[in-house]
Amino acid sequence: SLLKSDPDSSHILLDSIAVPDNLSDKLLARWCMLSGKVADTLYTDLPYVQQLLRAQAYYKSHGTKQEQAKIGLYLGRSYVEDKENEKAMKVYLQALDIALRSEDYNQAGYICSYMGDLYDFEGNYLLGKDKYKEAESYFRKAGNMRSSAFALRDVGRMYAFSDSLDIALIFLLKAD
């Protein structure tokens, strides 16, 4: 697909849609999903919360469980960009439940990682550590060893921030 072979062109193409809000619900949902994937690749901004809420409603009625979990992750991240952390956590919890019910462990790992990031941002390193550990177990279950290593690194960071450097070192060495 163009998204994988040339993400910059995908970004330009998606950006050429002047007013995405004028798209039908189906097309807006697809635009949001593709824009989220481009954001993951190029580290660009996600669609706005209102757009993602429409996409979420569409996927809830017409999408697969994987699509519902993925759009929930994007919506949560968009809430974080808007500094609406409580709303983000609520959406992440719903998306995690959907991902686990559909046994999409890789997606569950990413959702838990973003939840851990929120706890980290709030300075709640104990809850952050637990979420990163949960993410690591889901990544391992999905066979995503690269993301599993990053989650272990994040567990180590949480221990380091909690002044448990000996334990932090153990996790950082596991991640390596």
What residues fall within each predicted segment?
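A "functional boundary" signal
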Residues: 1-176
